[in-house]
Structure formats: structure tokens, C-alpha cells
């Protein structure tokens, strides 16, 4: 599982960025259109819609296995998936988008009000490439779990 920062485990740095949020919002709207047009699935910003997002991720992984696209070719898909996940979380659980710095690398990610950092684009990319080992529904459920329930 991708590491999550907590106050007790300072792995990285976070810098809020409104532009990253606007980009993620746009990609999440693209995801809603993509789900509707390609799969006939309605995404409604609810936690329950994550089941449908995982179904779409299954299909994208199958396409990936058959065609082996380049990282640049899958980028729009993992950005849509990850942005939708992040936007559900942001809207329902008080998080913000910005830049995460980890081991000197900087990439778009999120911070929950409690200080936990996570990067839904990276998880969505892993799901497309690796398959069910990186299940997005389980990832989202993990993010939503109360802190006292986490390992």
C-alpha cells in the first residue's frame, strides 16, 4: 500500500495549491462524462459511487494488459480516476489538493484536515497497471476509515 503521512510519521511535505484543485475538479468532471459515455455509469459524488469507479478501473486494466500503452497514454485515465476519488474525498471529508513532496519528488496529492497525505493519481495509475492488487474501492475505504482503526 502507498504510505500515508500522519503527524506521527512525517514522510513528506504538503503545499496547498488552488490550481491543482481546479485541474482535479476538471478531470473529475471528465471522469463523470467518460463513465456515462463509455460505460453507461452515472457517478454522483457519493461514497457509493466508488464501486462504479472500481468497475471502470477493472475495464481499464484489461485494456492495459492487452495493449500495453505508454505512461503518457494512460495519464489522462489515471488522472480522471484519481481526481474523481480525490474530489469525492474532498467534498465529503474536508481535504485539499496541492503538492506533495516525498524523497525530493513533487507531485499532485491531497491532505486531509487531520494532516494525512495521499495521492489518488498515483494509486489510480497503479490500479490500471497492476490490477486488482491496487483496488480503488479498498483504497477509498482505507482513506475513510477512522484513525483508530488503521494499523
Predicted regions: what they are:
Residues 27, 64, 78, 84, ...:
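Sequence-level detector for tyrosine residue identity
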Amino acid at each position: 500500500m502507498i504510505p500515508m503521512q500522519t503527524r506521527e510519521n512525517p514522510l513528506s511535505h504538503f503545499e496547498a495549491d488552488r490550481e491543482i484543485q481546479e485541474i482535479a475538479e476538471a478531470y473529475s468532471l471528465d471522469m463523470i462524462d467518460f463513465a456515462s459515455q463509455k460505460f453507461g455509469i452515472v457517478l454522483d459524488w457519493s461514497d457509493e459511487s466508488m464501486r462504479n469507479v472500481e468497475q471502470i478501473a477493472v475495464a481499464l486494466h484489461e485494456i492495459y494488459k492487452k495493449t500495453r500503452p505508454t505512461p503518457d497514454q494512460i495519464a489522462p485515465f489515471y488522472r480522471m480516476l484519481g481526481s474523481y476519488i480525490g474530489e469525492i474525498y474532498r467534498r465529503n471529508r474536508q481535504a485539499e489538493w496541492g503538492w506533495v513532496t516525498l524523497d525530493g519528488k513533487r507531485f499532485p496529492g491531497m491532505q486531509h484536515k487531520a494532516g494525512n497525505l495521499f495521492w489518488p493519481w498515483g494509486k489510480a495509475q497503479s490500479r490500471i497497471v497492476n490490477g486488482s492488487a491496487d483496488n480503488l474501492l479498498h483504497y477509498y475505504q482505507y482513506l475513510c476509515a477512522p484513525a483508530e482503526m488503521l494499523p
